[in-house]
């Protein structure tokens, strides 16, 4: 009898018992569905812990397999070490299972409940405070009224920041933060594998292709979004994206001189048949399809924003506050992988500018947008939100300096900002502002500048800008790839987030609303509201699609309608 036979049987017995326990726990999860008062957050936490236990079970199985001793002479030294490691893993696993059993018996964690009650109490106290202060305002006049109103807003800000801070800590308690980090990472890696598979066919001569020309008549942010739109259609129709970028107005050498190629194996647009876009079904037998700009796209496929893949939707809703933005960001992430020289430029600029956290990014667009697509906004409008967020950050971290990364196409703004706000440290490169002017915009130096601005804006802890600007929206999209959920890390002075050429942006009414003025629209729960914009005053504007009426409605009375599309899942990417 070999000396390890007993150990092997013992290991297998424990693994079998552990597997049985996992099955038992799973059964309890199913039975617990009869109790709807369990929050979705707690369910997410339990599922994440179960996933970790399953992974450890698989790790132990592999370790046990490695302990099989071949016939013949046995070297006992390494085997003894492996058994000890296995024993330690089993002890840890047993502790985790016991902790899990305690949590399922005892309900939510202590920290979770303490924070939940604190938020509940904070909301009640805020209501008491509002009632009391507004009653006082009725009896005040002149300077006394102004003074009391200012103090009222100051105290109101403290209340709001207290609740927001507690909500942040609630989102991190009981392992929820760790789960969100892992889930976001797993989803990103999954999508990037699928894109990489699509973009690198084994035989380019036989691959179906979608051709996209980068030279749309607009600036860098707009052109990048044009390529993203092409990429999403290519992904949905299972075609390799061929990006034509020679004689690019920003860099005559093309996209690949700045960013990594979109494919390592297939950059040739040739094929046995070529045609212009006429719809996914009609183009089925055409090998090479040329895509127009989104403004001229007809028929429109379902793959346009703000739709997300059906197979990922449930996971995305759990992990991210704006799944549509996250989905767009995955294509941006793949496209802007820098060439080594650009990577070096970014590193050197980071050191030269002294870019460090905490820092808030501010983007001020002053040239071609103002007067046409956007209104003029003075620096004071931006800095109100900068100061508010620094006060919020100060409740969670040490704010040694209030740093602001200022990106603008107005070279005079940096001096103005430093003069008006001496207590802030403004980080900015005025040479980028000069290169962003209309006369210098389409040069390689200008391209370098806008790429650096977008990089630093995306790296900030919070973003204040106008979403009417493509640069601001690109920075916000990239920000989503750097955090599990950065959907709330912005304030736009004008538009809500949108993607040029997107399909309708709809919301669903969750509370009834009866208009109090002629500007408002009625709503009933379940009504579909086509949102036009948020006025950032508690009201949004949109159309009640059931009634055909357009007007204002309270923003809190609706939720986002998540649009899903049956995208291909590319199972070959997992092989």
Curated annotation (Swiss-Prot):
Residues covered by the GT23 domain: 206-493
Asked if Transferase is a keyword of the record, the answer is yes
Biological processes annotated in GO: fibroblast migration; GDP-L-fucose metabolic process; in utero embryonic development; integrin-mediated signaling pathway; L-fucose catabolic process; N-glycan fucosylation; N-glycan processing; oligosaccharide biosynthetic process
Q: What is the effect of changing residue 369 to A?
A: Loss of enzyme activity
- What result is annotated for mutating residue 453 to A? Loss of enzyme activity
Q: What is the effect of changing residue 469 to A?
A: Loss of enzyme activity
Its principal location?
Golgi
In Pfam terms, one family for this protein is FUT8_N_cat
Membrane topology reported for the UniProt record: Single-pass type II membrane protein
* Matching SMART domains: SH3
Catalysed transformations (reactions): N(4)-{beta-D-GlcNAc-(1->2)-alpha-D-Man-(1->3)-[beta-D-GlcNAc-(1->2)-alpha-D-Man-(1->6)]-beta-D-Man-(1->4)-beta-D-GlcNAc-(1->4)-beta-D-GlcNAc}-L-asparaginyl-[protein] + GDP-beta-L-fucose = an N(4)-{beta-D-GlcNAc-(1->2)-alpha-D-Man-(1->3)-[beta-D-GlcNAc-(1->2)-alpha-D-Man-(1->6)]-beta-D-Man-(1->4)-beta-D-GlcNAc-(1->4)-[alpha-L-Fuc-(1->6)]-beta-D-GlcNAc}-L-asparaginyl-[protein] + GDP + H(+)
Q: Which cysteines are joined by disulfide bonds?
A: 204-266, 212-230, 218-222, 465-472
Important for donor substrate binding as annotated region, ranges: 365-366
Question: What is the recorded phenotype of mutating residue 368 to A?
Answer: Loss of enzyme activity
Q: What does this protein do?
A: Catalyzes the addition of fucose in alpha 1-6 linkage to the first GlcNAc residue, next to the peptide chains in N-glycans.
Q: Which family does it belong to?
A: Belongs to the glycosyltransferase 23 family.
Q: What is this protein called?
A: Alpha-(1,6)-fucosyltransferase
Give the source species. Answer: Homo sapiens
Origin organism lineage: Eukaryota, Metazoa, Chordata, Craniata, Vertebrata
């Amino acid at each position: 009898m070999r000396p390890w036979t007993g150990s092997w049987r013992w290991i297998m017995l424990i693994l079998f018992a552990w597997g049985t326990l996992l099955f038992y726990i799973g059964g309890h999860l199913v039975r617990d569905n009869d109790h709807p008062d369990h929050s979705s957050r707690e369910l997410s936490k339990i599922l994440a812990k179960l996933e970790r236990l399953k992974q450890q079970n698989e790790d132990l199985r592999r370790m046990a397999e490695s302990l099989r001793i071949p016939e013949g002479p046995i070297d006992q030294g390494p085997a003894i070490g492996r058994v000890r490691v296995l024993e330690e893993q089993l002890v840890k696993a047993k502790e985790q299972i016991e902790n899990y059993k305690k949590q399922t018996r005892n309900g939510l964690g202590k920290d979770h409940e303490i924070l939940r009650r604190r938020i509940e109490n904070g909301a009640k106290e805020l209501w008491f405070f509002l009632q009391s202060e507004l009653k006082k305002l009725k009896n005040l006049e002149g300077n006394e009224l102004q003074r009391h109103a200012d103090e009222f807003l100051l105290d109101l800000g403290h209340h709001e920041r207290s609740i927001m801070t507690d909500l942040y800590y609630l989102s991190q308690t009981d392992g929820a933060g760790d789960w969100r980090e892992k889930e976001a990472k797993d989803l990103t890696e999954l999508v990037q594998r699928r894109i990489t598979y699509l973009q690198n066919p084994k035989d380019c001569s036989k691959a179906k292709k979608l051709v996209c020309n980068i030279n749309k008549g607009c600036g860098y942010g707009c052109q990048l979004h044009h390529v993203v739109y092409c990429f999403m259609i290519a992904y949905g129709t299972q075609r390799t994206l061929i990006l034509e970028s020679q004689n690019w107005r920003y860099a005559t050498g093309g996209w690949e001189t700045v960013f990594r190629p979109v494919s390592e194996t297939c950059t040739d647009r040739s094929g046995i048949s070529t045609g212009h876009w006429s719809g996914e079904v009609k183009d089925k037998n055409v090998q090479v399809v040329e895509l127009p700009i989104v403004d001229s796209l007809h028929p429109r496929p379902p793959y346009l924003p703000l739709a997300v893949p059906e197979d990922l939707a449930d996971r995305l809703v759990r992990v991210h506050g704006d799944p549509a933005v996250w989905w767009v960001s995955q294509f941006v992430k793949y496209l802007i992988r820098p060439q080594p020289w650009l990577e070096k430029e970014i590193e050197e600029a980071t050191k030269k500018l002294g870019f460090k956290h905490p820092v808030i990014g501010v983007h001020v667009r002053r040239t071609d947008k103002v007067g046409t697509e956007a209104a003029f906004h003075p620096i004071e409008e931006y800095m109100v939100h900068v100061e508010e967020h620094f006060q919020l950050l100060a409740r969670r971290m040490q704010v040694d300096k209030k740093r602001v990364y200022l990106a603008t196409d107005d070279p005079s703004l940096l001096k103005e900002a430093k003069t008006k706000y001496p207590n802030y440290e403004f980080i900015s490169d005025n040479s980028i502002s000069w290169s962003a002017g209309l006369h210098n915009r389409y040069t390689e130096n200008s391209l370098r500048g806008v790429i650096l601005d977008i990089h630093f804006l995306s790296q900030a802890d919070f973003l204040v800008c106008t979403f009417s600007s493509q640069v601001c929206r690109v920075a916000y999209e990239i920000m989503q790839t750097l955090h599990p959920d950065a959907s709330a890390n912005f304030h736009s002075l004008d538009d809500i987030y949108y993607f040029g050429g997107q399909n309708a942006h709809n919301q669903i009414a969750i509370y009834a609303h009866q208009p109090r003025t002629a500007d408002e629209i009625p709503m009933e729960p379940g009504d579909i509201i086509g949102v036009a914009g948020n006025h950032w005053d508690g009201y949004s504007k949109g159309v009640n699609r059931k009634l055909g009426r357009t007007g204002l409605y309270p923003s809190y009375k609706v939720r986002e309608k998540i649009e899903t599309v049956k995208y291909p899942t590319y199972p070959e990417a997992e092989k």
